[in-house]
Design a protein with these regions (language model features):
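Short beta-strand edge/turn micro-motifs at domain boundaries
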Residues: 126-144, 234-256
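Short, low-complexity N-terminal intrinsically disordered segments enriched in polar/charged residues
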Residues: 140-169
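Bacterial N-terminal signal peptides
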Residues: 3-14
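Surface-exposed, charged secondary-structure patches
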Residues: 75-78, 195-244
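A short gly/proline-enriched turn/hairpin at secondary-structure junctions
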Residues: 58, 189-195
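Short, well-ordered alpha-helical segments enriched in acidic and aromatic residues
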Residues: 175-186
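Boundary at the C-terminal end of the N-terminal hydrophobic targeting segment
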Residues: 15-21
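Central antiparallel beta-sheet cores of small beta-barrel/beta-sandwich binding domains
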Residues: 22-114, 118-134, 148
């Protein structure tokens, strides 16, 4: 009973005074990333492709970094219905949500929204185990679900993901040699207000603490090293703290 009351309260907070938006996006050649959480504690990132008649996508939990497939549709311009599928195509979960005109978390202020914020529930296929879901759009890039990083010449997205996750985990666990080996040299960093060129791993290790400050390590740790934004200069971790090349190695450190 207490769990049911808690869910209802959470849904009320997320949905109070939020009018349904009209999301009419049809862009089959674009990937739209959303960040958010299930039950306000399980961090997720979702990528959606808005086709003419259906929605396809993937999402993953920040704690697992493993894609779960999605397939569904938009009804009446605002209701988003998605099936979560396993590798065999069996439905393992369902998302019933709405695009809303106002962000219940206030990220967009008083702006009237269309496809930017999704609010609803995730549940098991039989409708049990319902939990709230909230997602906010982070950005979009040209590509497909099977070739996200084509803009930088990548044929296998997992090459970038493996490199990004190796670097990300190494920074979090202070494995300095692995961090140093994850970079493409020469590379430039900001030290003491000046741009410094690092010729190889030894240069980075000698200046490691000055480069990877506590604040910089924290920003990297909060970012999600999968299904990242991409442009011609590389795949972007977080808000641009780190950039990766087609080989999965770090090409830029924005440590300023």
């Amino acid at each position: 009973v207490m769990w049911t009351v808690s869910l209802c309260v959470s849904l009320g907070v997320l949905g109070a005074a939020r009018l349904e938006a009209a999301c009419t996006k049809v862009e089959p050649g674009w990937l739209w990333n959303y960040d958010g959480a299930i039950a306000e504690k399980y961090r997720i990132r979702m990528t959606l492709v808005f086709g003419t008649d259906e929605i396809k996508g993937v999402y993953f939990y920040g704690s697992q970094l493993r894609d779960l497939r999605l397939k569904g549709r938009i009804e009446q311009g605002s209701r988003l219905l998605l099936d979560e599928l396993d590798a065999a195509g069996k439905v393992t979960g369902r998302i019933d949500a709405r695009f809303v005109t106002r962000d219940p978390k206030g990220r967009y202020g008083d702006s009237e929204l269309a496809c930017e914020v999704i609010v609803g529930t995730w549940s098991k296929p039989d409708g049990t185990g319902a939990m709230t879901i909230y997602l906010s759009m982070e950005g979009g890039t040209a590509g497909s679900l099977t070739r996200r990083y084509g803009a930088i010449g990548v044929k296998d997205d997992e090459v970038v993901h493996r490199g990004a996750q190796r670097f990300w985990r190494a920074v979090s666990s202070d494995e300095r040699a692995t961090v140093a080996a994850s970079l493409r040299y020469p590379i430039r960093v900001m030290l003491g207000g000046k741009v410094v060129r690092l010729a190889g791993p030894d240069d980075l290790l000698a200046r490691y603490d000055a480069i990877f400050t506590p604040a910089y390590r924290e920003a990297i740790g909060k970012a999600l090293p999968r299904n990242m934004f991409v442009r011609d200069q590389g795949a972007m971790l977080g808000s641009g703290e780190v950039w990766f090349g087609a080989d999965g190695r770090v090409t830029a450190l924005s440590n300023f």
